[in-house]
Amino acid sequence: EIAQCLVGSEMCIRDSYEKAAYMTALKLGNAVNVSESTVVRFAIELGYEGYPQLQRSLQSHIKNRLTSIQRMDVTRSRIGDLDPIEGVLTQDMDKIRHTLENVDREAFDNAVNTIVDARRVYIQGAMSSGILASFMHYYLRLIFDKVTLIGSVATSEIYQQMIHIGEGDVFIGLSFPRYAKSTINACKFAHDCGSQIIAITDSENSPLAQYAHTTLCAYSDMVSFVDSLVAPMSLLNALIVAVSNRNRCRVEQTFRKLETLWDNNDVYKKDV
């Protein structure tokens, strides 16, 4: 039966890898006419701790190659008839839990120290990761006046904005599958210029990690054609809070000034 599972799974993965990587053990077993327990034993025979580890390995290899149409097909097969609110929010909670359980605390502390001690901080993210980069830039700018957001996806313009980067600086690159070439190239450029590199990405196998001195991993996945960035955003929240805790006096002074400015310019509605 294991042999049958091996042959059947190989055919299933080869012929429809984008769906097979997201099948449950039960669905994969049904697809190759074996039991769910046989699929689990099959994963163990391949050297994995169980089927979930095999599944994550498959996903990490193929998710950067999935087109938007294939992503929509995968989501339909995973969520099925579930209410989108229940299905999507449950998956997002699992992503945060997985990130929390696997985050490298030493790497996290190194990232905090590097940002605090840096002469200048450059942040870059493209496509949907650009939202993460903007979010991080917004809050770090409230703590430091040394933070620059690299805002273009054109490689030549990125290099122009980074022309003065060098030793003593830190470059923070954010990218998740499908990885943006502009961010990979920017990481390499900053690395070659002698800057410290912090990669915020989905795994140590990410193309950003090869240039990084510190890699922070957050579990990322797709929901239909939408990139689920819930776990990366949560990790950024933690990183920003940790950095602000190291600069408590500076942050308090900044917000006292901001509160005065906001009051004087009637920024927020108060009679709510």
List each language-model region with its residue ranges.
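HTH-adjacent hinge/linker in prokaryotic transcriptional regulators
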Residues: 17-22, 26, 30-33, 38-106
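Glycine-rich phosphate-binding loops that contact phosphosugars or nucleotide phosphates
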Residues: 116-234, 238-247
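Glycine-rich phosphate/diphosphate-binding loops that line cofactor/substrate pockets in enzymes
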Residues: 106-118
